[in-house]
Protein backbone atom coordinates (compact mmCIF):
# COMPACT_ATOMS: atom_id res chain seq x y z
CA UNK A 1 0.00 0.00 0.00
CA UNK A 2 1.27 3.44 -0.92
CA UNK A 3 1.39 5.69 2.16
CA UNK A 4 0.57 8.74 0.03
CA UNK A 5 -2.95 7.61 -0.83
CA UNK A 6 -5.57 5.02 0.08
CA UNK A 7 -6.91 4.47 -3.42
CA UNK A 8 -5.82 5.11 -6.98
CA UNK A 9 -8.65 5.38 -9.48
CA UNK A 10 -8.11 5.54 -13.21
CA UNK A 11 -10.75 7.62 -14.99
CA UNK A 12 -11.26 7.92 -18.72
CA UNK A 13 -12.82 10.83 -20.62
CA UNK A 14 -14.37 9.82 -23.94
CA UNK A 15 -16.61 11.49 -26.50
CA UNK A 16 -16.53 13.22 -29.87
CA UNK A 17 -13.73 15.61 -30.76
CA UNK A 18 -14.44 19.18 -29.69
CA UNK A 19 -16.95 18.47 -26.91
CA UNK A 20 -14.58 19.86 -24.27
CA UNK A 21 -12.97 16.80 -22.69
CA UNK A 22 -9.57 18.48 -22.40
CA UNK A 23 -11.17 21.64 -21.01
CA UNK A 24 -13.01 19.64 -18.34
CA UNK A 25 -9.78 17.92 -17.37
CA UNK A 26 -7.88 21.21 -17.23
CA UNK A 27 -10.60 22.83 -15.13
CA UNK A 28 -10.65 19.95 -12.63
CA UNK A 29 -6.90 19.37 -12.40
CA UNK A 30 -5.58 22.94 -12.63
CA UNK A 31 -8.73 25.08 -12.19
CA UNK A 32 -7.95 26.85 -15.45
CA UNK A 33 -9.63 27.33 -18.81
CA UNK A 34 -8.37 28.19 -22.27
CA UNK A 35 -10.72 29.54 -24.94
CA UNK A 36 -8.85 27.99 -27.84
CA UNK A 37 -7.88 24.35 -27.65
CA UNK A 38 -5.78 21.98 -29.68
CA UNK A 39 -7.32 18.57 -30.33
CA UNK A 40 -5.80 15.83 -28.22
CA UNK A 41 -3.52 13.50 -30.16
CA UNK A 42 -3.82 9.96 -28.85
CA UNK A 43 -4.08 10.28 -25.07
CA UNK A 44 -3.08 12.68 -22.33
CA UNK A 45 -3.51 12.46 -18.59
CA UNK A 46 -3.40 14.48 -15.42
CA UNK A 47 -3.39 13.54 -11.75
CA UNK A 48 -5.23 15.13 -8.85
CA UNK A 49 -5.40 13.85 -5.29
CA UNK A 50 -8.64 14.43 -3.38
CA UNK A 51 -10.03 13.68 0.06
CA UNK A 52 -13.31 11.78 0.39
CA UNK A 53 -14.83 10.36 3.56
CA UNK A 54 -11.50 10.52 5.33
CA UNK A 55 -9.70 8.68 2.54
CA UNK A 56 -7.02 10.03 0.23
CA UNK A 57 -7.85 9.21 -3.38
CA UNK A 58 -5.45 9.71 -6.25
CA UNK A 59 -7.33 10.28 -9.51
CA UNK A 60 -5.43 9.48 -12.68
CA UNK A 61 -7.58 11.01 -15.42
CA UNK A 62 -6.98 10.06 -19.03
CA UNK A 63 -8.13 12.36 -21.82
CA UNK A 64 -8.63 10.54 -25.11
CA UNK A 65 -8.74 11.80 -28.67
CA UNK A 66 -12.23 11.80 -30.14
CA UNK A 67 -11.16 11.38 -33.76
CA UNK A 68 -11.81 8.07 -35.46
CA UNK A 69 -8.16 7.73 -36.51
CA UNK A 70 -7.08 7.46 -32.88
CA UNK A 71 -9.76 4.95 -31.90
CA UNK A 72 -7.43 1.94 -32.03
CA UNK A 73 -4.92 3.66 -29.74
CA UNK A 74 -7.45 4.89 -27.21
CA UNK A 75 -9.45 1.65 -27.02
CA UNK A 76 -6.57 -0.02 -25.16
CA UNK A 77 -7.02 2.45 -22.30
CA UNK A 78 -10.54 1.28 -21.52
CA UNK A 79 -9.41 -1.99 -19.99
CA UNK A 80 -7.89 -0.67 -16.78
CA UNK A 81 -10.38 2.13 -16.17
CA UNK A 82 -12.36 2.20 -12.93
CA UNK A 83 -14.67 4.90 -14.25
CA UNK A 84 -15.52 6.30 -17.68
CA UNK A 85 -17.04 9.73 -18.29
CA UNK A 86 -18.85 10.05 -21.62
CA UNK A 87 -18.92 13.70 -22.70
CA UNK A 88 -21.11 15.37 -25.31
CA UNK A 89 -21.64 19.02 -26.25
CA UNK A 90 -25.13 20.35 -25.38
CA UNK A 91 -24.94 22.60 -28.47
CA UNK A 92 -24.03 19.74 -30.82
CA UNK A 93 -26.78 17.23 -31.52
CA UNK A 94 -24.47 14.87 -33.38
CA UNK A 95 -22.17 14.55 -30.36
CA UNK A 96 -25.19 13.52 -28.27
CA UNK A 97 -26.40 11.04 -30.88
CA UNK A 98 -22.93 9.48 -30.90
CA UNK A 99 -23.09 8.73 -27.16
CA UNK A 100 -24.62 5.35 -28.02
CA UNK A 101 -21.57 4.55 -30.13
CA UNK A 102 -19.27 5.50 -27.26
CA UNK A 103 -21.28 3.32 -24.89
CA UNK A 104 -20.83 0.38 -27.26
CA UNK A 105 -17.07 1.03 -27.15
CA UNK A 106 -17.25 0.75 -23.36
CA UNK A 107 -19.17 -2.52 -23.63
CA UNK A 108 -16.56 -3.84 -26.04
CA UNK A 109 -13.35 -2.80 -24.30
CA UNK A 110 -13.96 -1.91 -20.63
CA UNK A 111 -14.48 -4.17 -17.64
CA UNK A 112 -18.07 -5.23 -16.98
CA UNK A 113 -18.47 -3.36 -13.70
CA UNK A 114 -16.86 -0.07 -14.75
CA UNK A 115 -18.61 3.03 -13.39
CA UNK A 116 -20.11 5.34 -16.02
CA UNK A 117 -21.21 8.98 -16.01
CA UNK A 118 -22.85 10.91 -18.85
CA UNK A 119 -21.85 14.58 -19.00
CA UNK A 120 -23.35 17.30 -21.17
CA UNK A 121 -20.68 19.99 -21.42
CA UNK A 122 -20.87 23.67 -22.46
CA UNK A 123 -24.04 24.31 -20.45
CA UNK A 124 -23.09 28.01 -20.37
CA UNK A 125 -23.97 28.33 -24.08
CA UNK A 126 -27.70 28.58 -23.38
CA UNK A 127 -28.63 30.36 -26.62
CA UNK A 128 -26.98 27.64 -28.72
CA UNK A 129 -28.39 24.67 -26.81
CA UNK A 130 -29.50 21.81 -29.08
CA UNK A 131 -30.10 19.07 -26.49
CA UNK A 132 -32.57 19.85 -23.68
CA UNK A 133 -31.53 18.73 -20.21
CA UNK A 134 -34.69 16.62 -19.96
CA UNK A 135 -33.87 14.70 -23.14
CA UNK A 136 -30.41 13.69 -21.94
CA UNK A 137 -31.66 12.92 -18.42
CA UNK A 138 -34.37 10.62 -19.80
CA UNK A 139 -31.79 8.84 -21.96
CA UNK A 140 -29.40 8.39 -19.02
CA UNK A 141 -32.22 7.11 -16.79
CA UNK A 142 -33.24 4.65 -19.50
CA UNK A 143 -29.78 3.09 -19.67
CA UNK A 144 -29.24 3.38 -15.92
CA UNK A 145 -26.27 5.72 -15.62
CA UNK A 146 -25.90 9.05 -13.76
CA UNK A 147 -26.13 12.28 -15.73
CA UNK A 148 -24.85 15.81 -15.15
CA UNK A 149 -24.46 18.99 -17.17
CA UNK A 150 -21.22 20.93 -16.84
CA UNK A 151 -19.45 24.03 -18.08
CA UNK A 152 -15.67 23.90 -18.17
CA UNK A 153 -15.71 27.62 -18.99
CA UNK A 154 -17.49 28.81 -15.83
CA UNK A 155 -16.64 25.69 -13.77
CA UNK A 156 -20.28 24.66 -13.26
CA UNK A 157 -20.52 21.10 -11.89
CA UNK A 158 -17.00 20.15 -13.02
CA UNK A 159 -15.75 19.42 -9.51
CA UNK A 160 -19.05 17.70 -8.69
CA UNK A 161 -18.85 15.42 -11.74
CA UNK A 162 -15.39 14.07 -10.97
CA UNK A 163 -16.08 13.79 -7.24
CA UNK A 164 -19.36 11.96 -7.89
CA UNK A 165 -17.53 9.50 -10.11
CA UNK A 166 -14.83 9.00 -7.48
CA UNK A 167 -17.44 8.42 -4.78
CA UNK A 168 -19.32 5.85 -6.87
CA UNK A 169 -16.11 3.91 -7.58
CA UNK A 170 -15.14 4.03 -3.92
CA UNK A 171 -18.58 2.72 -2.97
CA UNK A 172 -18.26 -0.13 -5.47
CA UNK A 173 -14.78 -0.99 -4.17
CA UNK A 174 -16.05 -1.05 -0.59
CA UNK A 175 -18.74 -3.56 -1.53
CA UNK A 176 -16.25 -5.92 -3.16
CA UNK A 177 -14.33 -8.63 -1.29
CA UNK A 178 -11.19 -7.49 0.53
CA UNK A 179 -8.16 -7.40 -1.71
CA UNK A 180 -10.18 -6.66 -4.82
CA UNK A 181 -9.87 -2.90 -4.64
CA UNK A 182 -7.66 -0.26 -6.20
CA UNK A 183 -4.69 -0.91 -3.89
CA UNK A 184 -2.07 -1.30 -5.17
CA UNK A 185 -2.78 0.36 -8.53
CA UNK A 186 -0.62 -2.05 -10.53
CA UNK A 187 -3.11 -4.83 -9.83
CA UNK A 188 -6.05 -2.88 -11.20
CA UNK A 189 -4.39 -1.07 -14.04
CA UNK A 190 -2.18 -3.79 -15.43
CA UNK A 191 -3.75 -6.94 -14.08
CA UNK A 192 -0.30 -8.18 -13.08
CA UNK A 193 1.24 -9.20 -9.74
CA UNK A 194 2.66 -6.40 -7.62
CA UNK A 195 6.13 -7.91 -7.92
CA UNK A 196 5.96 -7.70 -11.70
CA UNK A 197 8.61 -5.34 -13.08
CA UNK A 198 8.47 -2.94 -16.01
CA UNK A 199 4.69 -3.23 -16.18
CA UNK A 200 3.65 0.32 -15.48
CA UNK A 201 5.50 2.36 -18.08
CA UNK A 202 2.47 2.51 -20.35
CA UNK A 203 -0.13 3.16 -17.67
UniProtKB/Swiss-Prot annotation:
Membrane topology: Lipid-anchor
Lipid-linked residues (S-geranylgeranyl cysteine): 200-201
GO molecular function, a single term: GTPase activity
Stated name of the protein: Ras-related protein RABD2a
UniProt keyword annotations, A-Z: ER-Golgi transport, Golgi apparatus, GTP-binding, Lipoprotein, Membrane, Nucleotide-binding, Prenylation, Protein transport, Transport
Motif Effector region: where in chain: 37-45
GO cellular component term of the entry, any: plant-type vacuole
SUPFAM superfamilies tied to this protein: P-loop containing nucleoside triphosphate hydrolases (SSF52540)
Positions of GTP binding: 15-23, 33-40, 63-67, 121-124, 151-153
Primary site of residence: Golgi
Subunit structure of this chain's protein: Does not interact with GC5.
Organism (species): Arabidopsis thaliana (Mouse-ear cress)
The family this protein is said to belong to: Belongs to the small GTPase superfamily. Rab family.
A Pfam family reported for this protein in Swiss-Prot or TrEMBL: Ras
GO biological process: endoplasmic reticulum to Golgi vesicle-mediated transport; protein transport
Amino acid sequence: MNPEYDYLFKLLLIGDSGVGKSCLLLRFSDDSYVESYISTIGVDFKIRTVEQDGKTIKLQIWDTAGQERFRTITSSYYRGAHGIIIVYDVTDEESFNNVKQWLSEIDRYASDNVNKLLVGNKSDLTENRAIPYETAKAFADEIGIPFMETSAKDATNVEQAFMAMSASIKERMASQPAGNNARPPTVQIRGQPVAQKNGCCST
